[in-house]
């Protein structure tokens, strides 16, 4: 056999009769790109259904985002109790055949990225909660006392109230703004970076201001910067964590918030060993400057731990409507119980806020704390640190018992009202006990425990007041306004009580009144 014969192709045999089967409508289908004329193609295009890309849901209408925002105004450790009263979400992948490993933003993180998401949001909540707690409880009261002296209460009330009002409006604007941000860094990352820089710059300038008016101006700028961090971070938490791991992420997020608040207060107290002295060694100025740097470090660490956010340039765009900013704060219609739950929540928040805001003045001017010392702390700093640790321990104890307590009662109103009564007992301790220092420590322990129980057990009651499960995110956004109004009410009521009675201990009496009203209103829920 020659080489030419070897390379010669063998003839293909003819197919047997019936061996070749042409599938009707498949194999004999014409190529329309070749057979149709341009006029016919244009006519078909006009008749075809145009598939429009779905615009992502607004972050303020996502139930997970609002649950994260509510945790900041309540007891953060409640999320670690893993209660069955979960926030309903009709967009959850567990309700259809979608992959629960796919996040709401469409990404599918691997195991390492899931761990980074959990750790990143926990670290972010811890690191960003610390400076806010330090400033609210320790540093800003110190600085205002140094600047205005006897007018400290009015100055602090004005500063805090203006900050709360501005934060409310900025949260609405920034939520919409971040939803409509399109760039290679994503929708949330640019806001977090800008907010950290603005907060740091505002605090750095505030630390050298010697006029109350300037302190208020830069405090408000810092509030804008913090809103630029908090709202996008909460939105990212709601859309980047897959449903399968959301329960775990919620727990770590809540623990991060609680630890951050405790850490911030302790660091501020330890840093301001000589708050009234001039200079930068152990003074209020150095403490404020420390947390200015803290904001930058917190932003860097959070964004490095979190997986990089994907580009948002490809996302479908929708123009901002006029009602987009505050429409989510409208209360649901035909829900009479919603108003009752709203007012109860507002009063409970007011009861805790009015003592937290003025506790530095309470420790410094109404308690015999000059001789108190321990763990390197003296005077008012030791009292505030004691109250912070006691409140954290009380909340931690409540988390361990919250699950069994919630399951022991079929009617959630019972443990909620009992916790209100327990808070009243704790608030009465400083007024009734001869040892005031021990009394405020006991109050912090009992109040931390009672408020965590109330926050956890009332969650199912609050959700039951919502009329339509399809709009639960929007309804929770309206419900979250109770945190702002409650804090504002607490600040104003506390200032009026201190000014009228020229003492700080009556704050506990006002707190008792607010919590009693909250308990009565809670009994009206079903």
Feature annotation, model-predicted:
Residues 15-164, 339-344, 348-373:
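Helix-loop boundary and gating motifs at the non-cytosolic
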Residues 167, 248-272, 480-491:
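Glycine-rich segments within core transmembrane alpha-helices of 12-TM secondary carriers
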Residues 170-185, 397-411:
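Helix-to-loop junctions at the C-terminal end of transmembrane segments
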Residues 180-195, 407-421:
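Cytoplasmic membrane-interface "Motif A"-like loop-to-helix N-cap segments
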Residues 187-189, 272-293, 496-515:
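A membrane-interface helix-boundary motif in multi-pass transporters
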Residues 193-210, 421-435:
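C-terminal ends and interior cores of transmembrane alpha-helices
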Residues 297-306, 509-526:
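Multi-pass alpha-helical transporter architecture, strongest
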Residues 469-500:
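A late C-terminal transmembrane helix in Major Facilitator Superfamily
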